[in-house]
Amino acid sequence: MAAAPASIPDRARVVVIGGGIIGTSVAYHLGQLGWGPETLLLERDRLTSGTTWHAAGLMVTFGSFSETSTRMRHYTRDLYARLEAETGQSTGFAPIGLIEVAADEGRLEEYRRVAAFNRLMGTEVHEISPREIADLFPPARTDDLLAGFYMPQDGRVNPVDATMALAKGARMRGVTILEGTPVLDVLTTDGRVVGVRTAQGDIECEYVVNAAGMWARQLAERSGVTVPNQAAEHYYLLTDPIPGLDPDLPVLEDPGSYGYYRPEGDGMMIGLFEPVCAPWHVDAIPEDASFLTLPPDWERMGPYLEKAMARIPASMEVG
């Protein structure tokens, strides 16, 4: 647990609770709007703790029929591309491209509709053949695929670096960020926010942004607010080095095989999209879960992992 600050302010206009990718983004954008000196971000442990630090780091614009969601994806990609020049802190964004593949007629029809909408929204999308998929991503088995959809401007981002860049940008605009400062309660009067309570004392404020990640629901419950948010188990596998693997291959997503794939170091990251997820700690998320990893559940995930690895035959030959 991060050390508590020596002192805390007694007032802010906005208190942002949580220092993951969402909380730091909110703080950064409040700073852009001129609210920086009146904004306080409180992180219970260290920035990125919870779920941000081990996110897979995919930057995907494809997949939505929502105009709002698609515009946000475009904005986010552009933001990650320019933050380093603005802050001096890299986000790790690499526009290596992303390929969504379809192995059945139903998914192909769905993806063609998605592609048409995304093109309308300004996304660069190319429908490509199995041969072209193999050219772009040689480790993949492609003989059973019907087509792919290639977004050359998408790619990967480092979630820790991106969070730190947003935090630095927020500080540059006057936002105060305190680590080691868990919020114990949100204080209200007649249903209106008047402050937050911490172990170091109360802080008056007009607005609270609950960006507490997997703790958001239980924090909101203390104020009688329902946040429909539940942590779930998610697994990805990092293989041993694969000889000859190009580290700049595009990201490959194959929901039909329950998998997504991208190079990680000299090996491959294989993430799983299991059709039925497993909720984690439904009653309450442990307070000491800041940088927790879960032991593998081979009995539940084994069949999905085997199918996902079959898309990348070389992954079955290494550890």
Question: Which stretches of residues belong to each language-model region?
Answer:
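Beta1/beta-strand and adjacent pyrophosphate-binding region of the FAD-binding site
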Residues: I8-I22, L40
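Conserved Rossmann-like nucleotide-cofactor binding loop
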Residues: I22, L47, W215
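Gly/Ala-rich phosphate-binding loop of Rossmann-like dinucleotide-binding domains
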Residues: A27, G31-Q32, G169
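Glycine-rich FAD pyrophosphate-binding loop
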Residues: G31-W53
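Dinucleotide-binding Rossmann-like beta1-alpha1 core, especially the glycine-rich loop
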Residues: G57-L136, G256-Y261, G265-G267, D288, ...
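Helical element adjacent to the flavin cofactor pocket in flavoenzyme catalytic cores
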Residues: F149-Y207
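Central helical "cap/lid" subdomain
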Residues: D202-P250
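Active-site lid/adjacent beta-loop-alpha segment flanking the redox-cofactor pocket in flavoenzymes
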Residues: P241-G319
